[in-house]
Amino acid sequence: MENLLELLRTRRSIRSFKETQISPELVEQLMHAVLMSPSSKRSNPWQFIIVEEPGMLKSLSECKKYGCQLIDGAALAVVVIADPECSNVWIEDVSIASFILHLEAEDLGLGSCWVQVRERQTADGKDSEAVVRHLLDIPENLRVESIVAIGVKNEVKKPFDETRLQWEKVHIGKFGQTK
């Protein structure tokens, strides 16, 4: 396991993947990590659908107007869903879980990219969440937050440029008081 700051420096959104499958062992490691995600009152409102079938990846890559085509080239997609009855902060809980999935993918040497679904529309104006729900037979009582595309990186991105850290957004004691 790498140092957390190093993981944060090197983890970048990857939108181009090699045509390489991910072993079942690595998929299990990804899920192992995400299932340890913290949640409010340990409510664990999240559930995850692992999609590896190329035809379904292609269909998911059309779930919104912009920013989802990369799913078609991924080895797998993890559809992040939640039961809002379990927690009134389900959005925060699934967002934390999704980010842990990104960090674990990076730690395993894989690339990943978040594709927002909730509150998005397809190119022809349909609700993206409803489209994904229909494709994957997700019950109406569950919400679809996002899809995390994962695969072997086919692009190299520079680490995060720490000269871009916005220290002016850190306030000490009170708003407006900075370093």
Specify the residue positions occupied by each region the protein language model found.
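Acidic, surface-exposed loops and disordered segments
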Residues: 1-179
